[in-house]
């Protein structure tokens, strides 16, 4: 369960407060599948970072009773002067994986990412597409109670995108999901409730179609 209690988030710009949202509250039950909708610039990605505990609210409290992924496919966490294999091992150690678990996860990512010999080369030599494939594979190598998606659910060409889509669908079948997306077909497939953010306010919808209708009319 995730309980968001009266949170406010702002950034100081030139000494002035730029308020993204204030006094937001909602509860997502275990296994809940939540879409975060709204116009650009209203703080959807910031809200995800708050939920993942990457950032903290200026006011209010977020309580979590389950584990949360980092945003699926996030590429900024790699260390460029390590190889793909070394990066995955490093993340495994951060999660206190046993030696046997490390080898299983490394093998999974190596097979899924399909980067060939580059898996044992420095990440700094990768193309952007290769980094994305490695990142998605790493995201899927770990089990979480909630999976977080910030726009990108699949990467690469049509073949690899379908591969990502199929794997995520299987991986998250009985898990919670928190998704920011402008693709309403994807939202319909994976989410059953939504929040709509706009003008520093939050509107919670228990029926996904109601939220999509509002989003479509406002777009």
Where are these regions (language model features)?
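Conserved H-loop
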Residues: 73, 182-189
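A short, flexible loop at the N-terminus of ABC-type nucleotide-binding domains that lies
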Residues: 1-4, 9-30, 35, 58
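Conserved D-loop/post-Walker B switch-helix segment of ABC ATPase nucleotide-binding domains
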Residues: 157-166
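ABC ATPase nucleotide-binding domain signature region
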Residues: 33-35, 39-93
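Conserved catalytic loops of ABC-family nucleotide-binding domains
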Residues: 167-179
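H-loop (His-switch) and adjacent beta-strand-loop-beta switch element
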Residues: 190-207, 215
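ABC-family P-loop ATPase nucleotide-binding domains
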Residues: 10, 14, 67, 72-158
């Amino acid at each position: 369960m995730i309980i968001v209690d009266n949170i406010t988030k702002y950034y100081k710009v030139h000494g002035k407060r730029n308020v993204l949202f204030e006094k937001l509250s909602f509860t997502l039950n275990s296994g809940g599948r939540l879409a975060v909708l709204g116009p650009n610039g209203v703080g959807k990605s910031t809200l995800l970072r708050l939920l993942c505990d990457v950032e903290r609210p200026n006011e209010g409290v977020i309580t979590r009773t389950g584990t949360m992924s980092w945003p699926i496919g996030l590429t900024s966490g790699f260390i460029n002067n390590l190889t793909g294999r070394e990066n995955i091992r490093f993340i495994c150690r951060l999660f206190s994986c046993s030696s046997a678990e490390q080898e299983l996860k490394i093998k999974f990512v190596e097979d899924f990412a399909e980067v060939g010999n580059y898996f044992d080369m420095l990440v700094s030599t990768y193309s952007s597409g290769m980094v994305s494939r490695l990142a998605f594979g790493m995201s899927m190598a770990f089990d979480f109670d909630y999976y977080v998606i910030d726009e990108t659910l699949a990467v690469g060409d049509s073949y690899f995108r379908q591969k990502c889509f199929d794997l995520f669908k299987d991986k998250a079948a009985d898990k919670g999901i928190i998704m920011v997306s402008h693709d309403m077909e994807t939202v319909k497939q994976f989410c059953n409730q939504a929040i709509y953010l706009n003008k520093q306010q939050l509107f919670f919808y228990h029926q996904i179609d109601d939220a999509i209708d509002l989003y479509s009319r406002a777009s």
